[in-house]
Amino acid sequence: MSTGFFGDIQKIKYEGPDSTNPLAFRHYQPDEIVLGKRMEDHLRFAVAYWHTFTWPGGDPFGGQTFLRPWFEDTMKAAKLKADVAFEFFSLLGAPYYCFHDADVRPEGRNFAENTKNLNEIVDYFAEKQAATGTKLLWGTANLFSNRRYMSGAATNPDPDVFAFAAATVKTCIDATQKLGGENYVLWGGREGYETLLNTDLKRELDQLGRFLNLVVEYKHKIGFKGTILIEPKPQEPTKHQYDYDVATVYGFLKKHGVENEVKVNIEQGHAILAGHSFEHELALANALGIFGSIDMNRNDYQSGWDTDQFPNNVPEMALAYYHVLAGGGFKTGGTNFDAKLRRQSLDPADLLIGHIGGMDCCARGLKAAAKMIEDKALSQPLADRYAGWESAEAQKLFRGEYSLDEITNWVESHDVNPQPKSGKQELLENVVNRYV
């Protein structure tokens, strides 16, 4: 049943690359076969509940610009928001969505009331999922907006805040499991510091490790089959965040013995804030065996903060999905649009148009990446570059069968005098441009 919020807009359909209809897909075809698999099953698109339905359009210099009929902190408004959200998912044909607890329920007076409100809306979501076929990609807890978390959640100097946060995460994992969610995400927006003058780094990192182990233990206790994901970000809102980037997260996971239990949800905008490219973080996560899922968006490269815009750069998407595909593709993860409208984009149709453009951009990137893989456009030059390591002697060297003394003797006796070879960066950049 239509809520009327989107007027007479009908379900978004594919019309082909020559279409000028802003409410149609030009490149995204869910059933198109790419590398032997449906495009929808490769991309696994999800809509972010928070940016799409709860963001008021404010910025540091101005308040709310969006006037949504559900912008009240009541259960009635929460259910109206859910009605509009699931209508949106159906219009867009999005197979998944993601949420924080605070996005979907009204704020209660205490933990018990928060839990009651969450359970009520989860039951409502279950009905909506059954009616529409939309599924939950992942759930998470908002442990950063409420003032109780201003000094952190897991890393808070007050153990009562730690306990409140841990109990909240339990309820959110329960909700995620009840709704058939395929992952559970931890993002430590306040797990960091503003100044070292009042921060015990070792204590806070140890607290964070204990918190993470509690989550992993509870996952196994209840038989949750999904993946636990950490989302790296270097800063914002804190000056320095402990889950800075993929490399930092991996070191943290290793220290606390959960590197085989937890993977990463990588956001393009966060990679940029950390001084990396998106594909760097994806490639590193693959190399370390912790790639899980992605939050798809882009940052304004001039702004210096997290602008969460919809992706529109096909070459960037092609390289991103190249690494996703090269790593075997998504297992339980997917492509969550952690992106929001600009505050002047007031029309309900703008919500659809932003997602349509992002989905088309990702589809073009996916197809370009798939073609590069089929043609071995990058993998063959890479194999050629490292071919020397495939020899028997080089394999022994790699496996550690020679000591430094033996290596030195071998270099001297064989008069080893290697000469450099071209890295062919310009050629490879031109190769990529042929596909995009």
Swiss-Prot record:
- GO MF entry, a single one: xylose isomerase activity
Please give the biological process terms from Gene Ontology that the record holds.
Answer: D-xylose metabolic process
Q: Which SUPFAM superfamilies match?
A: Xylose isomerase-like
Q: Which reaction does it catalyse?
A: alpha-D-xylose = alpha-D-xylulofuranose
Cofactor note text? Binds 2 magnesium ions per subunit.
Binding of Mg(2+) 2 occurs at E267, H270, D306, D308
Give the CC-aspect GO terms. Answer: cytoplasm
Q: Where is the active site?
A: H100, D103
Please state what class of enzyme this protein is. isomerase
Residues annotated for Mg(2+) 1 binding in this entry: E231, E267, D295, D338
Q: What is its EC number?
A: 5.3.1.5
Q: Which cofactor does it need?
A: Mg(2+)
Keywords linked to the UniProt accession = Carbohydrate metabolism, Cytoplasm, Isomerase, Magnesium, Metal-binding, Xylose metabolism
Q: Where in the cell is it found?
A: Cytoplasm
Family according to the record? Belongs to the xylose isomerase family.
Q: How does it assemble?
A: Homotetramer.
What name has this protein been given in UniProt? Xylose isomerase
Organism placement in taxonomy: Bacteria, Pseudomonadati, Pseudomonadota, Alphaproteobacteria, Hyphomicrobiales
